[in-house]
Design a protein with these regions (language model features):
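Conserved HGGG/HGGXW glycine-rich cap/lid loop of the alpha/beta-hydrolase fold
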Residues: 2-43, 66-70
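Active-site signature of alpha/beta-hydrolase-fold catalytic machinery across serine-
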Residues: 19, 83-87
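Active-site loop/oxyanion-hole signature of alpha/beta-hydrolase fold enzymes
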Residues: 30-70, 86-87, 110-115
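Short beta-strand immediately N-terminal to the catalytic nucleophile in serine-hydrolase-like folds
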Residues: 71-73, 98
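Gly/Ala-rich beta-loop-alpha elbow adjacent to hydrolase catalytic centers
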Residues: 73-77, 81
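Flexible "cap/lid" loop of the alpha/beta hydrolase fold
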Residues: 86-132
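Helix-loop "lid/cap" segments that line or gate small-molecule binding pockets
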Residues: 131-140
């Protein structure tokens, strides 16, 4: 059986996998679903939220696994798992992009998001001040 690492998208936490985890475990797989920094139960300050911090969080989880993992990223986490694959390629057996951003080499999230201005993600990328306000509210 395999070890799955499930990485949630923006404004979610490990909780969003609550229906997936038992299904994979029932098939005999091991499942790890971390909260990214600043999401779910993680109290990292918004000023410390970077792609590097997200990638290191996931890489740390993967380094604790006993075998190469199936790394699954949802939505924004497509960017994260791409970065993790650069950090620990030998620890990953497969990457799975689940309705996720799949950036071209050197492409940023803001460039991906703003490529389609009718997309709600593009709206959020263009309105960073709203995101910062939302993060403050989420922590209250």
């Amino acid at each position: 059986m395999a070890t799955f690492v499930l990485v949630h998208g923006s404004w979610h936490g490990a909780w969003c996998w609550h229906r997936v985890v038992p299904e994979l475990e029932a098939l005999g797989h091991r499942v790890l679903a971390p909260d990214l920094p600043g999401h779910g139960d993680d109290a990292t300050a918004p000023a410390q939220l970077t792609l590097k911090a997200y990638a290191e969080c996931v890489a740390t989880v993967i380094r604790g696994a006993t075998e190469p993992v199936v790394l699954v990223g949802h939505s924004f986490a497509g960017i994260v798992i791409s970065q993790v694959a650069e950090l620990v390629p030998e620890r990953i057996s497969r990457l799975v992009y689940l309705a996720a951003f799949l950036p071209a080499n050197g492409q940023s999230l803001s460039r991906l998001a703003t490529a389609d201005r009718d997309n709600p993600v593009a709206y959020l990328a263009l309105h960073q001040e709203w995101i910062n306000t939302r993060l403050a509210w989420y922590r209250d």
